[in-house]
């Protein structure tokens, strides 16, 4: 058994105010567990995405999460959960007025991610990759169609 206070786990660079990788801190090898805190207007992921071989579950602790899906928007309030099958496209946002706290669980833990973001140069959503910004403690999203930067996160 291993126990860890969430506040003791370092937050990683993310579109969310806080993303704390609990699985690593707990030594969990067969499931990814991330703790998130999102201010109004923030999102869980770097873009609309899917994991071809991973199912993903979000449990909302406080606030309300809105998930953009292929079937339209779905809201999940505090003490509610949502599951995405492997290959389902989704992106969760905090469209409310209060802070959103949630846990995200994924299995298997190591999974490829297919990611799209809006590209101003190409127009519309385009396949995207994530890179570390040169000389900065930041991540950038790059359009794979034109090479343009579509987002910067620190």
Where are the regions that the model predicts?
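Short, cysteine/histidine-rich loop/knuckle motifs that typically chelate Zn2+
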Residues: 120-123, 144-145
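Short acidic-glycine-tyrosine-enriched beta hairpin
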Residues: 70-89
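Ligand-binding loop in jelly-roll beta-barrel domains
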Residues: 86-117
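Short linker/helix segments within small regulatory modules
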Residues: 130-140
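Short, conserved beta-strand element in jelly-roll/cupin
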Residues: 36-38, 50-68
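Short functional micro-motifs and their immediate structural scaffolds
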Residues: 124-129, 151
